[in-house]
Structure formats: C-alpha cells, structure tokens
C-alpha cells in the first residue's frame, strides 16, 4: 500500500491490482484493513479506527482510492461522488483495432449505452437502447498512445456503473488486456487487468482546497512503452 495524500479528514492510497477495497465473500484481508492498521500505528490511535469507504475499484484494477477519516468527510464525499463533483481519470490498454487506426490521437469519443447486470455471473451487459432493468451509462475515451498490437486509452466516466469501463470498451471490440470476463483472449501473468485509475481531483470536503493527485503506474513494460502516465 502506498499513501499518496493524507490529512485529518481523508487519506488517498494507490491500490495494487489483486487487493480488495472492502470485505467480500472471500474473507481476504482488505485495503481498508491495511489503511486502518497504518493509521493506528502512525498516529498511535487507541481502539477502533474510523475509516469510511467512499468508492471502490474492482479487485484486478489498480490506482487511486479515497477513504474518509471522519464522518463529516465521509458524508460530504458521498454527496460529491453522487453529484458528479469528483473528477476521475482512468487509463486502459486495449487491442489496436481497424477502427482505431482511423481515429485521430486525442479525439474524444463518447460511449452512451444502457447496462444491465447479471448478479450470478457478476457481469454487466451493454445495450444500445433501454431494456428492462437497465441503467444509462456514459463515458468518454481517447487514444493517447499506440503500439503494434495495443493502444493506450484515457477514459473519463459520466456515470459510475458496475464494470462500466470494462463492459463498454469490450462492446466496442476493445476488451481491456487481461480481462477474461469481458473477452480478452488471455490473462495477465499477475492476474491484473490493464486498467488503472490514474488521477483524481476534487474539492476537499472540509478545507475546500483543491485535491489533485496521480497514482504511479503498475511496474509493467507495456505501460511504459505506450506512454502510461506521461500524457
């Protein structure tokens, strides 16, 4: 666990792929557990440490995660996420497609579809029009790096649906590298998928100063070759 920013009200860390943010049926130790232990030791906190989970990243995804250290910060951050006042940026490595060859570098493309969720499969499905049980999902992406076989995309969400980036990119014929669930032909050696929450910016919930942080990239040559983090 790497701490990117901390103060009395919030703490921001760089989650590694494979870590879970909050407890699930596996019973595995969580990132929240590690952050609590860090706070307890660093500040010699007696008893239980308060830590509010504000948002999550899927287990195979890496990058920025924000936690609240006070109930005031948690309540306000929850409102900010709900009303779209948090700016999150992701980068993803996807296969280079014939269509992408004709797409100019840096040109933003909007994907606006409807997603349904299959709880049994823990998987989302994209639909071009509204269907029963679906929720609207929108994102923008652009190509910021190219290679012979893969492209590097920057992605910004307008909505925060379950597996949204993974599902919508896959529906365009661009499954994220290593994401077997959404059509990648093979897994990454470490079990990760090549999706990184690289940046977050928002107004501090208490001090109102601008918080603007970037998470270091996974130690992977392909990220470096495609220019991850340099755009």
Task: Give the ranges of each region predicted by the language model.
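RNA pseudouridine synthases
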Residues: 1-231
